């Protein structure tokens, strides 16, 4: 028996009425994972034993009728710490690492009696846009196994898109939730920087990283964000801002909503069919009463360059802790202390991670700091100011999530710069610390296209309101890949 076509509210109803137990729902989810895993390779670890034990304890305690998430299974990206469950960040250097603590976001999941069924595959240390940089396996797109799933949260996206789980958590440093959501036709949101605690997230770029939800529908996405949001004394960058009910505006119409369409988001490098799909989505929002107008974000063209200096610099610092001494992989044939560091890091890190550590170390080095890192910080401020100016007059910004649909596996491995440029539409949102969502908006050559909606700081509720209005009047989110029972 499978329950993966049922919404969270429908599953909650079944659990409360005792038509199914938490153990039965967890067993069904584990069966869905096993059945589809060979086709998509979403998971690094399936935590069957822990999940079933948790479900059994919940059945003994009883489902809380007032807690929508009680007994709901989900998957978690493998760079989010889970006590006693392997957390590798898809790296050889952490191949055997079991944290002794839970990330705050995981604590919040457990606090709502949610059941973690496994840890999803990703690009190593979240560095990449295709999930091909994993030490363990290559995740495949849920719609076409010859295509990339996007990255770095590829496994979290394919787990939802293929019907293995209804919900998952990912992390987004430069588009790592939104781009795989776009490539797999699911809903993925990067919250405002500081909305969700980063404590327990294995750091890549500390001023950019943010944990966020994947789901089948907009409402379920908001329901999961309700669980994981809030201030955390363990994360000094987590916000004191009050957490609203993110579902509160869902169902409200969008008449008079002012939406900006930056001309830079529809320019050079954007596939013509993707552009047509997004313009059609903009027209559809206009038909619902929104006002869509063209604007300019002049400094967004520098976003990719700025991002790769800042993110790589932060990574070169953050990844110094993986030294072969405290935990994780240690090379053999060691003769002295320097050997421990050099060999363990050389053998333990993959090529892309080493590339970014070198780039970041160079950007921070004496003589280049002013020309690169300092300058990147100044341009980042200009990018933030561009957004602030637009949000003085507009409620949201609209554009494609990615410039293309999913591309062939292996096609960009030898050209890292081409892969970096694929994030040009998502990166500015991280640089400015803004919230952004990707929702299904159509298909090009049988592959999903994501519509990106960007909101002002801490205004996720307006993003969800507009995304839900679009979803309620289109059927793109109802179209499923063959692996999930869709039509060929």
From Swiss-Prot:
Enzyme's top EC category: ligase
So which residues are the signal peptide here? none
Q: Which reaction does it catalyse?
A: L-glutamyl-tRNA(Gln) + L-glutamine + ATP + H2O = L-glutaminyl-tRNA(Gln) + L-glutamate + ADP + phosphate + H(+)
The organism of origin for this protein: Streptococcus sanguinis (strain SK36)
Question: Origin, by domain of life?
Answer: Bacteria
Q: Name one GO cellular component term.
A: glutamyl-tRNA(Gln) amidotransferase complex
The protein, known as: Glutamyl-tRNA(Gln) amidotransferase subunit A
Active-site residues per Swiss-Prot or TrEMBL entry: 77 (charge relay system), 152 (charge relay system), 176 (acyl-ester intermediate)
The free-text function statement in the UniProt record for this protein reads: Allows the formation of correctly charged Gln-tRNA(Gln) through the transamidation of misacylated Glu-tRNA(Gln) in organisms which lack glutaminyl-tRNA synthetase. The reaction takes place in the presence of glutamine and ATP through an activated gamma-phospho-Glu-tRNA(Gln).
Query: EC number(s) on record?
Result: 6.3.5.7
Query: Gene behind this chain?
Result: gatA
Family the entry assigns: Belongs to the amidase family. GatA subfamily.
GO aspect biological process, one term: translation
PROSITE patterns in the record: AMIDASES
What subunit structure does UniProt give? Answer: Heterotrimer of A, B and C subunits.
* Entries under PANTHER family matching the protein: GLUTAMYL-TRNA(GLN) AMIDOTRANSFERASE SUBUNIT A, TRANSAMIDASE
């Amino acid at each position: 028996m499978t329950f993966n076509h049922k919404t969270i509210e429908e599953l909650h109803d079944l659990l409360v009425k005792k038509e199914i137990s938490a153990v039965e729902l967890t067993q069904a989810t584990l069966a869905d994972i096993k059945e589809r895993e060979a086709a998509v390779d979403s998971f690094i670890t399936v935590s069957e034993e822990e999940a079933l034990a948790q479900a059994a304890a919940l059945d003994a305690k009883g489902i809380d009728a007032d807690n929508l998430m009680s007994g709901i299974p989900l998957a978690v990206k493998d760079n989010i710490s889970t006590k006693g469950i392997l957390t590798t960040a898809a790296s050889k250097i952490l191949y055997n690492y079991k944290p002794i603590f839970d990330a705050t976001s995981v604590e919040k999941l457990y606090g709502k009696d949610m059941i973690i069924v496994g840890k999803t595959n990703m690009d190593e240390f979240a560095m990449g846009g295709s999930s091909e940089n994993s030490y363990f396996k290559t995740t495949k797109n849920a719609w076409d196994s010859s295509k990339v799933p996007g990255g770095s949260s590829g496994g979290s996206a394919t787990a939802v898109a293929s019907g293995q789980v209804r919900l998952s958590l990912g992390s987004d440093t430069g588009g790592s939730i939104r781009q795989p959501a776009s490539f797999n036709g699911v809903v993925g949101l990067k919250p405002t920087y500081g909305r969700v605690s980063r404590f327990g997230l294995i750091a890549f770029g500390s001023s950019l990283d943010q944990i966020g939800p994947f789901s089948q529908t907009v409402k379920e996405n908001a329901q999961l964000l309700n669980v994981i949001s809030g201030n955390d004394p363990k994360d000094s960058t987590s916000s004191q801002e009050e957490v609203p009910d993110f579902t509160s505006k869902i169902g409200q119409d969008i008449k008079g909503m002012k939406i900006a369409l930056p001309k830079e988001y529809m320019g050079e490098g954007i596939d013509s069919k993707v552009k047509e799909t997004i313009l059609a989505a903009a027209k559809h929002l206009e038909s619902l009463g929104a006002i869509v107008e063209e604007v300019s974000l002049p400094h967004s063209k520098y976003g990719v360059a700025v991002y790769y200096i800042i993110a790589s610099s932060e990574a070169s610092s953050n990844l110094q802790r993986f030294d072969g001494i405290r935990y994780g992989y240690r090379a053999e044939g060691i003769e002295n202390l320097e050997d421990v560091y050099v060999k363990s890091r050389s053998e333990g890190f993959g090529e892309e991670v080493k590339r970014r550590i070198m780039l970041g170390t160079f950007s921070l080095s004496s003589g280049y700091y002013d020309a690169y890192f300092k300058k990147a910080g100044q341009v980042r401020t200009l990018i933030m100011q561009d957004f602030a100016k637009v949000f003085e007059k507009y409620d949201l910004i609209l554009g494609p999530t990615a410039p293309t649909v999913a591309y062939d596996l292996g096609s960009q491995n030898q050209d890292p710069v081409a892969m970096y440029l694929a994030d040009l539409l998502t990166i500015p949102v991280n640089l400015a610390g803004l919230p952004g969502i990707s929702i299904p908006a159509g298909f090009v050559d049988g592959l999903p296209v994501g519509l990106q909606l960007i909101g002002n700081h801490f205004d996720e509720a307006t993003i969800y309101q507009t995304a839900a209005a679009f979803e309620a009047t289109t059927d793109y989110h109802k179209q499923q890949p063959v692996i999930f029972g869709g039509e060929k």
